[in-house]
Amino acid sequence: MTMNLINKKNLNIYLCGPTVYSDVHIGNLRTIIIFDAIFECLKNKGFSINFLHNITDIDDKIIEKAQELGISEAELTEKYTNEYFKILEIFNIKKPTKIVKVTEKIEKIIEYIKLLEKKGFTYYNKNNDLVFDILKIPNYGIISGQKIESLLDKNTKKTKSKNDFVLWKKTQKGLFFKSLFGLGRPGWHTECAALIYDYFQKKSLDLHGGGVDLIFPHHENENAQHFALTGNPIAENWFRSGFVNLNGKKMAKSLNNVLLAKNFSHKYNPDIIRSIFLSINPTVPINLTEELIKNHKKLIEKYQKICFEWYFDKKNEKTEKVEQVLNLFIEGKFAKANFLIMELIKQKENSTIRKIFLNLRFNFTKMRLDPESQEKIKNWNKLIMDKNYSEADKIREELWKIFKNS
């Protein structure tokens, strides 16, 4: 990830959130866990983060699931929105600056669509949906690196081009809203673009995040709408995380091959998945296996021990080394950053390593020795000086148990 941060201290950032009709799986957390760590690294460098995250609480999948369960869409989405917030807390992910539900901003989204219509970027298809005409955007394809000619196969049944997308879907199925375009609801691509346009006051984002699977058509269509209204790209920088596979297969609910985030947390320390996600360069696919989880479980135990040993040897941290490692994480060079961490471990630079872990927001950094326990370290030091190693080991073992249970 390369970000142009010259002359910037306040960063406007957006990440597409979950469609809340079911529990999130562990792969859904890759981008937001990485963001959580990188944002802390940026704050360490003096940056201010203005982070918008949306909750898609109206969608065909939501309507179908609510009807299947015999409950309202609002009941369903409230349940899974709250479940998502619990997951953020369990995995030690800071809540974004602002979280907004799509249904809270329907009027703003309608106003946004009106602007696109007024500027002549829309038409009605044969279903009477209001559609965005990509032929009106000369640089359509710039985000996904595609030539517009390859995207313009005709689809005369409904739209001028197969890639024209719905801004307002005319429907009375499930939850719908009143607008000048008829009864219906907004299209997904428009929801995100409108929220960004409104919250960030028409400005381009400094960073837009998401998974690699969203490059086309979602990110492309968001950008097309923003460009149509402002003449500028929707984001100056993009961050996209790679796929998380499970035992060699794509992790997807449709394939019945998922590991729910809540189930992961019941079985494993949540720091393990943070360690996995921060050890592999962001765009590289991850194959989640029992062996990989086991390896990072051992690594987390090693990291915990380092934070414990810091109490016994609080030498000054090497600020330049901390900055070097954090900069590598900001640049998305996770493998190189982890190599340097391993070098620091060999050198027993515990203060420096602990500072890095604090910035990466590992939950184990909250483990503490209380003042009374720290006083016992003085006794330990005296016993070491007196070469009474067996008694010193007993104190150390006692303190380790206190630390682990803190």
From Swiss-Prot:
GO terms for biological process: cysteinyl-tRNA aminoacylation. It catalyses: tRNA(Cys) + L-cysteine + ATP = L-cysteinyl-tRNA(Cys) + AMP + diphosphate. Zn(2+) binds at residues 16, 192, 218, 222. ATP binds at residue 253. A motif ('KMSKS' region) lies at residues 250-254. GO terms for molecular function: ATP binding; cysteine-tRNA ligase activity; zinc ion binding. One of its GO terms (cellular component) is cytosol. This is Cysteine--tRNA ligase. It comes from Mesomycoplasma hyopneumoniae (strain J / ATCC 25934 / NCTC 10110) (Mycoplasma hyopneumoniae). The lineage of its organism: Bacteria, Bacillati, Mycoplasmatota, Mycoplasmoidales, Metamycoplasmataceae. The gene is cysS.
